[in-house]
């Protein structure tokens, strides 16, 4: 008799647990995934490239990444104590112009350009900075 009572209590507890279980709905999941690509600037692929050619290169990369399902771009804007954006505090990056501290000619702001182009495509823009690196090679001069 005792075994039957324990089984009944166990069965009732099991049933009660099912009544209070919560159903997972689709709204509990994020609206979308964060599918990001990182566009770095330290390998010199932009150095000395004419402005229009560089812009077209970046647009081409964004178009390809968008077609691949990427919805966020992480763009390296501060590679080595310099900037790929207009700044009162940091010199222009040598990875953009070839010489640290030299503004691009014709003048443009690569970070603002990327923000605008990402948003045109419905992509998020995230600025990547290297807060500690000052140089990638001993041969380069700082501004």
Name each region found by the language model.
Residues 32-34, 38-40, 44-56, 116, ...:
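Active-site-adjacent "subsite" loops/lids of carbohydrate-active enzymes
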Residues 1-7:
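Bacterial N-terminal signal peptides that target proteins for export
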Residues 8-18:
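Bacterial N-terminal signal peptides
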Residues 42-52, 92-108:
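The substrate-binding groove and active-site-proximal loops of carbohydrate-active enzymes
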Residues 56-83:
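Catalytic domains of carbohydrate-active enzymes, especially glycoside hydrolases
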Residues 19-23:
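Boundary at the C-terminal end of the N-terminal hydrophobic targeting segment
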Residues 83-98, 133-143:
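Aromatic- and acidic-residue-enriched segments that line the glycan-binding/catalytic groove
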